[in-house]
């Protein structure tokens, strides 16, 4: 392969760029990186637009929304009699003897509504929690109306809490523009005392004196954020772990038997999901999602409670009244909000105020026996919603409102679909980028391995004339000649210079002798000859010599083309001093180590 440039046999296209070689893979990698950067910029823009539309939608519907869910009839006799509760889309009418009351709410779920129907209305507010807003979802109502069923579910019919946790993890796995981390905490407010439900299990019996190790305190920062000191906060990496910790906490909740409910909650159960979100180089956002299963409002005469159970009922009613005061003050935008009237409202203070989203699901019973409790629960909902039935919006305004809500819903759906498509494009681009990087890394490794490796697979991609680069040819041949010679036996720079000058002198001498062999008649005319003729003759002798000595390798002769006259040749031959003949070091003809003319002392 003498006189050629050799490169690794790879499917690589090379081009000279500013005097260097640049792989086309690098261009592909740069193009893919620019494409991913543009896609992520578009993704952030769409996500910001979706957040704005969602905030407008929630504000239009109301930052504090009140739903009502009617429990299915339990007694067989109730199916035969007409229920006193009549349900419309946003209105509930309660009829009794000589009484008819109407209550307006944001949405009514009748007796045939499913867990999925309820959760679909909860989904938008969960997106606000992922966007960085504090969110609070509460289940309120009389004992035995299905609050715990709505929040927890049973028999495979998941409630709001497990569905919300599942939705959070599902969205986090699909959103490639942000990184999410979640943690869970559970506590209960039992008779004005806060208990941690994720600590080691407490004794099964209820006591008015709680364990000192489970007492935690509530602290408020200058910015208004609430910190529950001493509360267990468990990081959850997947849905399975989250469900395990949630089941552990709800099993530790205080319950008791009453005349109304066999398993009556005797406390307020609060589940907190802390969401931390980081998007690129921006600062980390932290938000809280509170899922609250409130204790049942009850009348002592109906429940038949006494002793400790009666005290628990009183504590529940007091905290529910304080919660109603807080929500009413917030809806009316009063300057003072009485958060400190209850442990419950004190804990939820930063998730009920400005910038937060609140959703309350009020539960009622369709039974005639529960008309009194139904009216009380709906009055609480009316107070929280702070809208009088006589001051309902006109039909035209309602239509405009519904039209605007539909437009915002469509805008959110379009943005979410486009975000989904962008996520797929980003994933494909990132996959291609990884493949290009691996291919480029493999190519660079192959080039590094083949450098100086004579056994590498090589291919000729170009030809270089030896006359144009004699130094490169000489170096290549020199490395080939001395590749197997030990370092201390290889020729030095001075010896190579002597070899070169001696070879040049010997060439001139052979040329002089060859000229003297020609007759004088052949030199008549110009009395000169070109160096190329002599060079051809020298090549012929070199070929003959190489055939007799196949293992010997000589360096190529390098000389400019010379025109010499007969007289100059004679004078040069006569005046040239006799030099000691020198040969190139050859592995096949090198002298034994003890006869080498270099001093061995220089090796130590």
Curated annotation (Swiss-Prot):
Region (Disordered): 465-511, 565-604
Residue ranges, compositional bias (Basic residues): 593-604
Chain sites annotated for binding ATP: 141-148
Polar residues bias (residue ranges): 565-574
Domain Kinesin motor: 63-387
One cellular component term from this protein's GO annotations in UniProt: kinesin complex
Superkingdom classification of source: Eukaryota
One Pfam family linked to the record: Kinesin
InterPro entries the UniProt entry points to: Kinesin-like_fam, Kinesin_motor_dom, Kinesin_motor_dom_sf, P-loop_NTPase
Keyword annotations from UniProtKB, A to Z: ATP-binding, Coiled coil, Microtubule, Motor protein, Nucleotide-binding
GO biological process assignments: microtubule-based movement; spindle assembly
GO terms for MF: ATP binding; ATP hydrolysis activity; microtubule binding; microtubule motor activity
Coiled coil: 22-61, 383-443
Record PROSITE patterns: KINESIN_MOTOR_2 (PS50067)
Family according to the record: Belongs to the TRAFAC class myosin-kinesin ATPase superfamily. Kinesin family. KIN-14 subfamily.
Name the UniProt record assigns to this protein: Kinesin-like protein KIN-14O
